[in-house]
């Protein structure tokens, strides 16, 4: 990967008049860009400082850390940036309106320049004061959070923002970066060099070649050639600044449902919390197209949307969340415990308690050349992005659990046919009944029992698969270019390096599951036995899918996360 500056793109002209909206769209726009009442502004006033701003003054530059928002008392503020990033109908902020979007919650970076379009009087509200206001004023909290989230959703829906991704639908790296940006809810524009008429002009403009892809252009000035997701996260400023001299109350490892549940409850109860996630919020559940048996969502909710809401909620209460950071090592020899991230520089994080919610990963197909097709025909998530890649084609879904069933039903909406491959004799022991009924009734889904993939073929992209039914059955070849594998569960515990007691499958043992021999081997130092979710190391808990004996469901994981926080309070009081 290399990074190099290029010449900035000229600023956009002031916004063109908006096209007529439907009543529903107008109502949504009013929520995204509300006008505060005098009484509401009066409650904000003591938390900020008044500034008189001349026309043309820049209040925030694209790429700078978002440390404040501005409430307009008089005059007008404009968003200014490259047309390719912002589009044509760019809103301005007039009297009673305020700047900002979802980036302010995480301490990210400005997606565009904020500049005074006319002489203005504004109230400048620092990020910490804003977050305190959100935590203490329910009415203003609803207004700010709804506006920030809706503004971000508009950018995503319109493929606008501060990221341009040049790549190909047949490129593994392109898909991985698209998945990372999509699951983290970061707006971007994707240019498929195989189909876009202006692709050569794009390559020339940024001085890159087709062999460099995927290429990420951050903020119109920084070019990343074939970057890792950690490098993309750093360029976009997705992570807050962490004080590595502080001793935190709690470090949570993993931002799946269990980790997010723990973060929300811990932060809302006043604990100083840092959460570390290797990819994107949601974990394995975040790749589910629709979860229909989660309490309170009768119409269902996608795993990504559920995770995104919890992510915002945890930050609302003050949790600091590190994205694209994997934990390399847990130093369990001294207290406070030390948590070292593989992609981090400097000192490890110091903490009095740890909740491990690192989850599980799908088992990889036992096929020799699998790595050639990862992201080029073999996928581990079923979201709208993957569905677009295989519209009107025959596809295969491997696995018999709920995640595989949800994927099959979702993909059947756009695919020509879905072949569901399972090694067992049926779905009854591994899948919820409501999903089984839908799969059996769907005309485009065909279930193949006692069947497994034994071969993958293709040149650059998957073109054909081979499967076998039964141990001694014949091998059949099928012209299938897309395989979704959602089978088995490998616990993410290799990084623990013997620090904790594990079961024979690598899951973390807790509470009553810990034997006398386990505690003796770990040299358990306390008179009391381990708490319900506590591991063989005092003050270190495990929750969710990574815990031995846990129920592998989203609701169970969230519940364990909240229970663990109650235990953390007891541990901190010892």
Q: Can you name each region flagged by the protein language model?
A:
Residues 120-125:
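A short hydrophobic beta-strand segment most commonly corresponding to one strand
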Residues 2-57, 94, 103-105, 131, ...:
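Cyclic nucleotide-binding regulatory module and flanking cytosolic helices
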Residues 160, 165, 169-197, 206, ...:
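Beta1-alpha1 glycine-rich phosphate/pyrophosphate-binding loop at the start
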Residues 195-253, 268-269, 286-287, 321-393, ...:
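FAD-binding core/adjacent interface of flavoenzyme oxidoreductases
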Residues 307-351, 356-358, 412-527, 570-574:
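A Rossmann-like FAD-binding core segment of flavoenzymes
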Residues 244-281, 366, 372-374, 380-433, ...:
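Rossmann-like dinucleotide/flavin-binding elements
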Residues 40-43, 109-111, 115, 128-162:
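A small-molecule sensor/coupling module
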Residues 32, 38, 49-119:
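Cyclic nucleotide-binding regulatory domains
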